[in-house]
Every structure is written in structure tokens, then in C-alpha cells.
């Protein structure tokens, strides 16, 4: 959690991508995280009128696919590397610089905290699948990556239980996740009609 997550100008990427037309972003947008969802938010924000969009990542590289990053750069998205979010404010996020030592360890550099002005800040930090349901529910199999095993309709190995999203496919684009989730919702509806 980052201090300031509940401010009115701070949003989660997944919420924005569901209905981008309902958001008034302003001209400057900051995005924390650099996965495929962050690229989706960045490109969508530019199309919806933002003039300057910057993606901030804690490492020296971006987690999104090469294709997604290239498209974002073509669209005019800016990238800031080795930044650690300290606090979110109504004037924009505050980041500290991260230095990487010779052993490859990342350390926040004290005294480098700086406000990066933005009208809107998005949190697009990827989150791995949550394993609580698998560890507390019998009959749901997972693969070697810890993802829930499902058929083409999202049915798990336990009767009557369906799954979709990152917990099934890993980190994909929001468009792919929504497409599969809609198919799973249809399969769930069909299943429930037979009960």
C-alpha cells in the first residue's frame, strides 16, 4: 500500500479500463507500474485527452511486452526508470530514486524524494495470482506456475467452480482477460441453467 491511495485523483488501472469515459483525467497522468495493464492505461489516457502521460517503474526495465512498449512509445508515452513511490498527493506522486548496487540489489536512495506533478495518478502494479482459495479449497488443481487449471470454458477441476483472469492465464492484457472472462461468464450461466 502507498500512502494516499484513497485520494480522489488516484485510481486503479483495472477500474479505469472498465469504463475510461467516466474519468476526467486532466492533462498530466502518472502511472505507477510498467506491465501490460499500465501500457493499456497510458495509451487509453492519451486517446481520451491527456496531454502528457508518464509510466514510472521501480526497475531498469519494463515488464510489459516489447510490442506494448513500442506502441506506447509511438503514442508518446514517457518512461521514468528506477523510481520508488513514497506517497500519492493531490498534486501528483512523490517518488524516491532507486539505485542498483553491484550485486544487483535495489535500494531506495535517501533524500531523493521529489514530487512529479500530475492531475491523475494510476496504480498499475501487477499482482500475482492469489493462492488463498487454492490452499483453502479442496479439488482445485494448479499448474507448475501456480495458476488454476481450467478447461476452455473456465471450469476448474472441482465441479461447479469456475475461474478466469490472471489467476488462470497469468499476466495478460486487460483486453485478453476481459474476452476470456466474458466467455467464462457465459459458461457459468449455461451451467447454472442446468441446476
Where are these regions (language model features)?
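General small-molecule cofactor/ligand-binding pocket signal
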Residues: 11, 78-80, 94, 162
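A conserved short coil-to-beta-strand element within the FAD-binding core of flavoproteins
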Residues: 82-92, 97-99
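Rossmann-like dinucleotide-binding cores of NAD(P)H-dependent redox enzymes
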Residues: 42-86, 195
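Rossmann-like NAD(P)H-binding beta-loop-alpha module
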Residues: 24-50
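Cofactor-binding loop segments of dinucleotide-utilizing enzymes, especially the Rossmann-like FAD-
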Residues: 34, 57-60, 166
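FAD-site-proximal beta/loop scaffold in flavoenzymes
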Residues: 5-26, 103-110, 114-171
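A conserved FAD-binding loop/helix module that cradles the flavin
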Residues: 41, 164-195
Amino acid at each position: 500500500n502507498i500512502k494516499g491511495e484513497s485520494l480522489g485523483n488516484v485510481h486503479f488501472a483495472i477500474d479505469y479500463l472498465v469504463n475510461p469515459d467516466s474519468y476526467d483525467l486532466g492533462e498530466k497522468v502518472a502511472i505507477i507500474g510498467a506491465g501490460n495493464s499500465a501500457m493499456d492505461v497510458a495509451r487509453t489516457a492519451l486517446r481520451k485527452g491527456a496531454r502528457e502521460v508518464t509510466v514510472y517503474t521501480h526497475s531498469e526495465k519494463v515488464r510489459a511486452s516489447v510490442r506494448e512498449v513500442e506502441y506506447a512509445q509511438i503514442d508518446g508515452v514517457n518512461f521514468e526508470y528506477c523510481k520508488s513511490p513514497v506517497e500519492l498527493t493531490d498534486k501528483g506522486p512523490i517518488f524516491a530514486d532507486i539505485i542498483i548496487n553491484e550485486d544487483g540489489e535495489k535500494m531506495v536512495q535517501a533524500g531523493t524524494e521529489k514530487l512529479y506533478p500530475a492531475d491523475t495518478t494510476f496504480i498499475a502494479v501487477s499482482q500475482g495470482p492469489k493462492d488463498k482459495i487454492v490452499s483453502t479449497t479442496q479439488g482445485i488443481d494448479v499448474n507448475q506456475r501456480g495458476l488454476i487449471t481450467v478447461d476452455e470454458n473456465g471450469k476448474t477441476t472441482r465441479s461447479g467452480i469456475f475461474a478466469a483472469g490472471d489467476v488462470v492465464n497469468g499476466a495478460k492484457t486487460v483486453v485478453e482477460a476481459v474476452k476470456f472472462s466474458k466467455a467464462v461468464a457465459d459458461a457459468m450461466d449455461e451451467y447454472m441453467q442446468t441446476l
